[in-house]
């Protein structure tokens, strides 16, 4: 029973830790236009996009390396 509880807990932690990687890529309405990276599930990779500087979400990384690090379980 304890093993089952630990297994379920581990699965929930993993899925919660990468859930932001599954959020849509949101450029935002502002016009700062900075290069950012986001995980794109349809291609299972991090891709570059232009972020406007406001109203984005947590699927928004300053570098490809950061994106790949945080979303590596989905690659």
Curated annotation (Swiss-Prot):
**What are the subcellular locations of this protein?**
Secreted
The answer on whether this UniProt entry bears the keyword Isomerase reads no
Tell me where on the tree of life, at the top rank, the source sits. Eukaryota
Where is the secretion signal located? 1-17
Q: Name one GO molecular function term.
A: potassium channel regulator activity
Key word Disulfide bond present in the record? yes
One matching Pfam family, short form? Kunitz_BPTI
Q: What GO cellular component entries does it have?
A: extracellular region
Q: Which UniProt keywords apply?
A: Calcium channel impairing toxin, Disulfide bond, Ion channel impairing toxin, Neurotoxin, Potassium channel impairing toxin, Protease inhibitor, Secreted, Serine protease inhibitor, Signal, Toxin
BPTI/Kunitz inhibitor domain location? 21-71
Entry comment describing in which tissues the protein is expressed: Expressed by the venom gland.
Q: List the disulfide bonds.
A: 21-71, 30-54, 46-67
Where does it primarily localize?
secreted
What job does this protein perform?
Answer: May exert inhibitory effects on serine proteases and on potassium and/or calcium channels and then participate in the long-term non-lethal paralysis on the prey.
Q: Provide the family line.
A: Belongs to the venom Kunitz-type family.
| Name assigned to this protein | Kunitz-type serine protease inhibitor As-fr-19
This chain's source organism reads: Anoplius samariensis
Taxonomy of origin reads: Eukaryota, Metazoa, Ecdysozoa, Arthropoda, Hexapoda
């Amino acid at each position: 029973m304890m093993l089952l509880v630990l297994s379920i807990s581990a699965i929930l932690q993993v899925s919660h830790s990468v859930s932001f990687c599954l959020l849509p890529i949101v450029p935002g309405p502002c016009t700062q236009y900075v290069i950012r990276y986001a995980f794109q599930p349809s291609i299972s990779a991090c891709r570059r996009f232009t972020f406007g500087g406001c109203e984005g979400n947590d699927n928004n990384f300053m570098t490809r390396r950061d994106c790949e690090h945080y979303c590596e379980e989905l690659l």
